[in-house]
Swiss-Prot record:
Keywords: Cleavage on pair of basic residues, Disulfide bond, Hormone, Secreted, Signal, Vasoactive
Tissue and organ distribution: Brain, spinal cord, spleen, heart and fin, and to a lower extent in gill and ovary.
The protein's name: C-type natriuretic peptide 4
This protein's encoding gene: cnp-4
Propeptide, chain numbering: 23-96
Organism placement in taxonomy: Eukaryota, Metazoa, Chordata, Craniata, Vertebrata
Organism: Oryzias latipes (Japanese rice fish)
Amino acid sequence: MNLSYLVACGLLVTFLSDKMDAQPLTPAQQKSLRSLLGEELAEFLESGENENRLDDVRSRMRLLRDLRVDTRARGMWARLLNDQPASRRHKSGSKKGGSTSRSGCFGHKMDRIGTISGMGC
């Protein structure tokens, strides 16, 4: 039973791949295309310039994608190595009472809560 499905799928793929070939437009098809889409759009679609433009756009998109990936990778390595400039403000001082002084608890400058006393503020 599985063999019959395999043969059927193989035949289906063969028939579909045969029908999917690109073929140039015949003069009758070109005429109907012009009548449906208009003269300007039909000429644009038929011309080879759109292939050059498409290649140009693809190359620009590829360059932008590579640049974006490159900057992401640099940012990741900078975070890992901690080389990026410190854009955050230092979080020091007491947050209680709105004090703006840089001294920590009890007049001592502390990096973390409880580094001196072991209990915090």
